Amino acid sequence: MKIIGCMVVVFALAGCRQVPAHGYVPVSQYDPRRDADKDINDAIAEAHRTGKRVLLETGGEWCKWCHIMDKYFKDHPKLAELRDRNYITVKINFSEENLNEKVLSRYPKIPGYPHIFILDIDGKVLQSQNTGELEEGQGYNLDKFTAFLTGWARRVEAPKS
């Protein structure tokens, strides 16, 4: 009977979604039903906790280049690792279903999609990046994208002796 009880517990736990211990759940999909303001505030709180910067990626499921960027990160795991090591990434939906006008009005005008904003740990805009400048052919330029992510990553000063 103990074996059956243990098996029930194991199977029940196997179905549980793992949530990080600190409670932050990354926003990795464009979703018109999400509360973008809350998502950004949660990311800023996580940035405070981790010392990372916030990378807002605005776009939508309708956006061809948004899908190209997603695939580019999947195809270039070291670039994705660089992003994830230095940034709390939040996808902000912009679509007919939800323009997120109130939230996006706080940021510089967006010339095209996808568009990236880099925020400091207090939510201040450090960079508004037209991703067209990172493109090459039907994809992105690895050197340019790497330089962009590296250049805006937070620098931690070495302790003074």
Report residues per predicted region:
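C-terminal motif of bacterial Sec signal peptides marking the signal peptidase cleavage site
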Residues: 14-15
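Short active-site neighborhood of thiol/selenol oxidoreductases, capturing the structured segment around
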Residues: 50-64
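Typically the conserved alpha-helix immediately C-terminal to a functionally engaged Cys/Sec
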Residues: 67-82
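Non-catalytic, surface beta->alpha helical segment in thiol-disulfide oxidoreductase systems
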Residues: 110-159
